[in-house]
UniProtKB/Swiss-Prot annotation:
Primary role: Catalyzes the GTP-dependent ribosomal translocation step during translation elongation. During this step, the ribosome changes from the pre-translocational (PRE) to the post-translocational (POST) state as the newly formed A-site-bound peptidyl-tRNA and P-site-bound deacylated tRNA move to the P and E sites, respectively. Catalyzes the coordinated movement of the two tRNA molecules, the mRNA and conformational changes in the ribosome.
Organism of origin: Shewanella sp. (strain MR-4)
Stated name of the protein: Elongation factor G 2
Family under the similarity heading: Belongs to the TRAFAC class translation factor GTPase superfamily. Classic translation factor GTPase family. EF-G/EF-2 subfamily.
GO annotation terms (biological process): ribosome disassembly
Keyword Magnesium: no
GO MF term set: GTP binding; GTPase activity; guanosine tetraphosphate binding; translation elongation factor activity
A Pfam family the protein falls into: GTP_EFTU
């Protein structure tokens, strides 16, 4: 077993095409886990093992890989860069202790890089920066360093400088040791020599080395004082300070190279060992009660504690069902019986593996710090806590965003319904941001996801992985409804049909709630006019109707219901009577409260070459977008805007046409906003037409 201080659980984060999967491949090649590094553009990479990933050249799932470097165990997770799969990034951040942020040497800080960086900041994950693709035309290391300051508000700590650039890129100078690492043109990572610093770089190296030392010694008052008095710190002292500053995110050690050309990667691996934290050097995970409130207790990272582990990913592959688990505390052995605190059920551990992406190496035991896969677990979902039967506990839960787009699907042949249902069930277990429901009116199966590409991939998996041929409908926007006016009202439910009847009277106020408040229930009933035992029934009845609004049948958001008075009958009143009264009250009063249709607004971040900025902004304006910011860069302009989701279908094709394929964008849900009347009228009409068509079937 590797000692805990030598574990590094790291993720690799980047924008699409910045080279993070290739970076992972080179890590595996250098650490001896694979003999020939696959290329993403050839569809051969180790971590992009899904057919859809290999074909599209993007990472969709977070693939976990274990490897070793200088007696340290790396558990590496290669995460997606496309915005539709940021839930995978979030899920990975939950179980990581550190990360490598990969930026393109020519593209710089691109839209999705910023999103992933923000997620990592929120999760307090320490990172080093790797500026990749310095062999590319237009690459400029120091320009990207400046962008990380300007765009990400980060403090990069430059650790190396490139020798040459673009076609002339040969290697890097290590500022700490003042040594030049120069690779030959064979493309083999081990074919390098350590040389003197090139004469024309000496002054630049000394300038950046001085900046490095000045920043590092701020982590140690005694060292800083000695440095100010003219005493240069040792390399060991500097590394200790850099490690401390990296762990606290005071700065981010920044390296450069070319993963594709195998140049500069060894220094990045050394930096993972030297500067990123071990599992016992990060804040321990909090424990919560059943409602998700923190208890004040923590999962102490130690093999001597009772078992506390988090299932962070479920995957169905050619070997069967895999549950990926991060062990925070304790030990886990083959044959152990553990408790799933979310279900209250126990389960016996069968086979356990460490993963080389899509291949497995079976293991007998694992302990705190490990990321492993367990084969064949039942009734386990992403976010469930696995713990010692004698010491039940719950780790802080994962929260996933609500889907904003949906499509209707149906099997082409009648016999495919059961096959489709089984396949979708497995896919939901694997991806918590993918949802499914059945339309009550039409009986259609509705798939919901985070974006067009997300659902395209899911449909593709259903067809190719599970062999379900589908009829796929047009994408539908997840509209919502709300109210804009307060209404004071009352409703009496009375039913008499021999024997005991039903009676429940409620007086109430409904008013617009705070944004993102959902449904809020209050009671200001004085005395016993509506006994307290019936209040939950009133709340349940009204809340159950919030799923279907009165404008077009969309779910209702942000409504406050206050029960003010009412009446009951000693014999005829019951919880069910008051629940029915509340349901009828919803139908009666929501229409009086001036309901309004809401549409999802997306935060859109577009990169455009300078020549096309006017076209891009004009197009966003035509899509009812509101321009929030424009940031000029060296190679183009970043345009940030809020745009309705309904206007963004097919946008990538339009952007590529406008920019001759050079434009890029990312998009994530921002908020719900009132629909203009003209748009609302069209939506209502479309819903009516759809229902009429379904009624004829």
């Amino acid at each position: 077993m590797t000692e805990l201080s030598k574990y590094r659980n790291i993720g690799i984060f980047a924008h699409v095409d910045a080279g993070k999967t290739t970076t992972t491949e080179r890590i595996l090649k250098l650490t001896g886990r694979i003999h020939k590094a696959g290329e993403t553009h050839d569809g051969e990479s180790t971590t992009d093992f899904m057919v859809q990933e290999a074909e599209r050249g993007i990472t969709i799932q977070s693939a976990a890989v274990s490897c070793f470097w200088k007696d340290h165990r790396f558990n590496v997770i290669d995460t997606p860069g496309h915005v539709d799969f940021t839930v995978e990034v979030y899920r990975s951040l939950k179980v990581l202790d550190g990360g490598i942020a990969v930026f393109c040497g020519s593209g710089g800080v691109e839209p999705q890089s910023e999103t992933n960086w923000r997620y990592a900041n929120e999760s307090e994950v320490a990172r080093i920066i790797f500026v990749n693709k310095l062999d590319r035309m237009g690459a400029d290391f120091l320009r990207v360093v400046k962008q990380t300051k300007d765009v990400l508000a980060a403090t990069p700590l430059v650790m190396v400088l490139p020798i040459g650039i673009e076609d002339e890129f040969k290697g890097v100078v290590d500022l700490l040791t003042r040594q030049a690492y120069v690779w030959d043109e064979t493309g083999l990572p081990e074919n390098y020599s350590i040389q003197e610093i090139p004469a024309d770089m000496v002054d630049l190296v000394e300038e950046y080395r001085e900046q490095l030392i000045e920043t590092a010694v701020e982590q140690d008052d005694d060292l800083m004082e000695a440095y100010m008095e003219g005493e240069e710190p040792s390399i060991e002292d500097l590394k200790r300070c850099i490690r401390k500053g990296t762990r606290t995110m005071a700065f981010f050690p920044t390296f450069c190279g070319s993963a594709f050309k195998n140049k500069g990667m060894q220094l990045v691996l050394d930096a993972v060992v030297d500067y990123l934290p071990a599992p016992n050097e990060v804040d321990p995970q909090p424990l919560t009660d059943e409602e998700g409130n923190e208890t004040g207790e923590y999962a102490i990272v130690s093999a001597d504690e009772s078992l506390k582990a988090l299932a962070f990913k479920i995957m169905d592959d050619r070997f069967g069902a895999l549950t990926f688990v991060r062990i925070y505390s304790g030990r886990l052995k083959k044959g152990d019986t553990i408790l799933n605190s979310a279900t209250g059920k126990t389960e016996r551990i069968g086979r356990m593996c460490e993963m080389l992406a899509n291949d497995r190496i079976e293991i007998e035991s694992a302990e705190a710090g490990d990321i492993i896969a367990i084969v064949g677990m039942k009734n386990v979902q992403t976010g469930h806590t696995l713990c010692d039967v004698k010491y039940p506990c719950t780790l802080e839960a994962m929260v996933f965003p609500e889907p904003v787009i949906s499509i209707a699907v149906a099997p082409k042949d009648k016999g495919g319904s059961e096959k489709m249902a089984i396949a979708i069930g497995k896919m939901i277990a694997e991806d918590p941001s993918f949802r499914v429901e059945t339309d009550e009116d039409s009986g259609e199966t509705i798939l919901k996801g985070m974006g067009e590409l997300h659902l395209d991939i899911k449909v593709d998996i259903l067809k190719r992985t599970y062999g379900v041929e589908l009829i796929v409908g047009e994408p539908q926007v997840a509209y919502r409804e709300t109210i804009t006016q307060m209404v004071e009202d009352q409703y009496t439910h009375k039913k008499q049909s021999g024997g005991s009847g039903q009676f429940g009277k409620i007086e109430y106020i409904i008013r617009p709630g705070e944004p993102n408040s959902g449904f809020v229930f209050k009671s200001s009933v004085v005395g016993g006019n509506v006994p307290k035992e019936y209040w939950p029934a009133v709340e349940k009845g009204f809340a159950s109707m919030m799923n279907t609004g009165t404008i077009a049948g969309f779910p209702v958001l942000d409504v406050e219901f206050e029960l003010t008075d009412g009446a009951y009958h000693a014999v005829d009143s019951s919880a069910i009577a008051f629940e029915i009264a509340a349901k009828a009250a919803f139908r009666q009063s929501i229409a009086k409260a001036k309901p309004q249709l809401l549409e999802p607004i997306m935060k859109v971040d577009v990169f455009s070459p300078d020549d096309n900025v006017g076209d891009v902004i004009g197009d966003l304006n035509r899509r009812r977008g509101m321009i929030k910011d424009q940031v000029a860069g060296v190679t183009g302009v970043r345009v940030k805007a809020d745009v309705p989701l309904s206007e963004m279908f097919g946008y990538i094709g339009t952007l590529r046409t406008m920019t001759s394929g050079r434009g890029q964008f990312s998009m994530e849900f921002s908020h719900y906003s009132p629909c203009p009347n003209s748009v609302a009228d069209k939506v209502v009409e479309q819903v009516k037409e759809r229902k009429a068509a379904e009624a004829k079937k």
